[in-house]
Each structure stands twice: as structure tokens, then as C-alpha cells.
Amino acid sequence: SKEMILGSSGNQGAGAFYSHQIEQSARLDYADNSHFDRNYGDGTDGSNTDFTLSFWIKRVGRFGSTSILINPRDGTSGTALNEVGWDTSNQFYFNNSNSGDTILKTNAVFRDPTSWFNLVISADLNNGTNSERLKIYLNGSEMTYATDNRGSYTSAAGFGRGGSWVLGDYYSGTSYTPDMYLAEHVYIDGTTYGPDSFGETKGGVWIPKSVSGLTFGTLGYYLKFEDSSNLGNDSSGND
């Protein structure tokens, strides 16, 4: 897979090489149970079939322990949700927890405490081709999967649903917070984008692109983590 260079916030160089630089990141710390809560009004729904997520991440600990990256929950039922993160084998997974199914789990493991990487999740759940319904990309390339249940997956239980979403933990409060740095996290509601909307290859490395021209949709958000007094500030224009 391609190496990823973050830019100024990764202390790996800047200047003319980067068309877009990520300036800040947030530290999610298991010891402090640090995470983000995003609360939508119940019944304020978007699309639970077409959505995209992008994360720029550096894991620094909690290897070998279940670590939840994002846990969106339907506010109407309170129990319908998705769960996305790393399992005890450090494989990355996407669960539809309402049915208890693991939809995708990667062959690759994530246990490098030094490198930044970009994860993109693209969903087009009405697609008639099973392999096109849900994809996970690492630094611009689609990953291969140890578990693949996309054939039975046609609507998300949590994504696209108004309710209480948790970034960096499980909704019940049981601590599954990862130890990691998180930069420029984007959720797109209603549109399926590929990884080239969030990054590009330059000089053999994967670097960030500006997302300011993307359509964020009803429930979409854009977290830059640039305001230390309000790290969860949404830069998408929806707040």
C-alpha cells in the first residue's frame, strides 16, 4: 500500500508539495475515555444507503483490544446502530450491530504506532453488484477482506439515522476508546465518494486533498479539530 504523508500537522514537511495541508489533529486517549458525541434530533434522518466517511489516523496504542472508531445510533429505536473499529486481532471491521453481523473485516492488521494513514468507507447499498455496495480504502487503495457479507447488506442501521452518534467509543459508555490521533474527519450523507475525493498520490505518497467542494448532505459534517476550545466544531456549514 502507498505511504501516507499528512503535511504540517504530521511534522513531515510542507510547502509547495501539498495542495492542502491538515493543520491540527485531536488526541483520543483511552486512559481519559476521550471521545466526541454528536447528537441529532430524533427523526432527523438522511440517507442510510448512500454515505461516505474519511478519517486520517495514527494509532499509538490499544493494540490487541477492541477499539471503536465510530458508533452511530438511530435515535428512534435507540438500539439500531453501526459499529466501526478494530478488533482484538487489530483487523478493521464494519458491523451492522442491529443484526449482529460483521459486514466487512479486513485481512490487513493495523498495529504500526508511527504512521499516519487515511481510511475511506464508501457505501452505495442499493447497488446491484454486491462488491460495489460497501468498500474500505486504505491510502487510496481498496482493501481485501477476511469477512465479506455485503450480499445481505442493503441499509445501514445507524448511518443516515438521526440520534446519538459517538466518535471514539461505544454508545453505552463502556470504554472502547482507541489510543490514536485523528485528523480531518468527514462524514458525507447522501453521496458515495471514492478515496480520490480525500487524497491523491504525489511523489509516490498519499497526501490530503481539500474537501471544501464536496456536498455534505443533511447529516454530514467536517471536523478539522482546529479550535482547541471547541474541538467538535463542524466546518461543513451544517452547524
For the regions a language model picked out, list residue spans one by one:
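Extracellular/periplasmic catalytic domains that process cell-envelope and extracellular macromolecules
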Residues: 46-47, 86, 112, 158-161, ...
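Short edge-strand/loop segments of extracellular domains
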Residues: 70-81, 133-144, 203-208, 238-239
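Extracellular glycan-interaction patches encoded by glycine-rich segments
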Residues: 157-182
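Short surface loop/edge beta-strand patches of beta-sandwich-type extracellular domains
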Residues: 29-51, 102-111, 171-174, 208-214
